[in-house]
Amino acid sequence: MSFLSALFRRSAPSFGGGYDADVSKLPPLGHDGPKTLMAIMAHPDDIDFGSAGSIAKWCAEGWTVYYVLATSGDKGTHDPAFTPQELAATREEEQREAARVLGVKEVFFLGYPDGFLEPTHELREQLVRLFRTYHPEVVLTWDGFRPSFNHADHRKIGIAVRDALFPATRDRLYFAQHDAEGLGEWRVNEILLVGSPDPNYFVDASPFIEKKADAILAHASQVQSHDRDELIKQMRSRGRRPGGRGLVESFKRVHMRSSQRAQRAEEAQRQDGVTQPDESPGAPDAPQSAREPIESPR
């Protein structure tokens, strides 16, 4: 059994592959002002197993990043010493520490029961409220339409996020009470889908591999070994294969209409005679090693 297989208390996740993948930069949003990303997943640790290297990179580049977890992972253990309430409190604290390590600004927990998440009207309203309040240009979430077998909560949060983004966040009369509260409509520019079977967007997060290891190990209730050096060694060894890199994380990039902030900046640039260069979204023909599903143990 490999170290990575032995590290986790239940099933071992993938950390992303992409040894030969072309590496993409996060697409420019057409402005030089604040850039905000909101990562939304079902359980504490879901974001970090698949995307912690990229999150650390974007935070270091000046992005404001928020985490949103639909549940607190209150069923994710085999340890009989935990009650659901104790486990939820533990995992919330672990997630806050992992987010601190990476530079995430704030973590939100929506409090839904682990294992029973549904894309309800209530959940959609909460997500729309977050989008209209914090104005992310980019949203990162699970690919809810991935065809292979995976956790039901992962599928449900991916679907819920898409339904909240379009058309509900854009159109004022969805959840019209927000308008009365001063929360206007909002348009998100990009969606990055984790765990997609056909990723087209690859981030070289090699300089942040140690931060990713620290974020993973912050989820202490979910790992059975805390050997940081060995974890880093194993993650690096995956990238030393021919043509490889130390840490590449893969996403399916979906472009939506430009956000209001980007539209305003793009219009100003057009008036000044400035145009944005066209950039490739990545490597659609990346090898299978870049397409491995990324899923946390819980």
Model segments located where?
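Active-site rim/loop-helix segments in enzyme catalytic domains that contact anionic ligands
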Residues: 1-134, 270-272, 288
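Metal-dependent de-N-acetylase/amidase catalytic core
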Residues: 2-38, 118-298
